Amino acid sequence: MTIKLVCIGKTDKKELEALIKIYSDRLQHYIKFEFEIIPDLKKTKNLDENQQKSKEGELILSGVQNSDFVVLLDENGKQFSSESFSEYIQKRMNTGLKRLIFVIGGPYGFSEEVYKRADSKISLSKMTFSHQMVRLFFTEQLYRAFTILKNEPYHHR
């Protein structure tokens, strides 16, 4: 199985990018992990929020196949502990999926089309984080999930 994280816009801070790369590289030990960055939209001054979400949604969905399991990182999604998130990942792997895709939306969230296509929604916290930080937090939690599944000492219960 491949796990893919799809994000809108590049990471602004090189320090964050370096930390994300550390966890992305570590994940390769457990599973094929891909990080896809959809470039920020150009000329958005004349677009309202819904138009921007719609255009971003088209770009997100253009890379999604019918057989993919799509999970949105959304403030209204289900919350997990690190242990229960590892169980969630294991359940997805047990289904024989080829690709599990996690998506971090743009500044205004997701379009209705993306919500309709999504198979699941998860939330990292009730708190609000920058989309840049969510990339790091999610990648670290995904790495943590695999160390939990493998009973490795990274996670302390």
UniProtKB/Swiss-Prot annotation:
GO terms for molecular function: rRNA (pseudouridine-N3-)-methyltransferase activity. S-adenosyl-L-methionine binds at residues 73, 105, 124-129. Keywords: Cytoplasm, Methyltransferase, rRNA processing, S-adenosyl-L-methionine, Transferase. InterPro entries: Alpha/beta_knot_MTases (IPR029028), RlmH-like (IPR003742), tRNA_m1G_MTases_N (IPR029026). It catalyses: pseudouridine(1915) in 23S rRNA + S-adenosyl-L-methionine = N(3)-methylpseudouridine(1915) in 23S rRNA + S-adenosyl-L-homocysteine + H(+). Its EC number is 2.1.1.177. It is found in: Cytoplasm. One of its GO terms (cellular component) is cytoplasm. Pfam families: SPOUT_MTase. Its main location: cytoplasm. Homodimer. NCBIfam families: PRK00103.2-4 (NF000990). Belongs to the RNA methyltransferase RlmH family. Specifically methylates the pseudouridine at position 1915 (m3Psi1915) in 23S rRNA. This is Ribosomal RNA large subunit methyltransferase H. It comes from Christiangramia forsetii (strain DSM 17595 / CGMCC 1.15422 / KT0803).
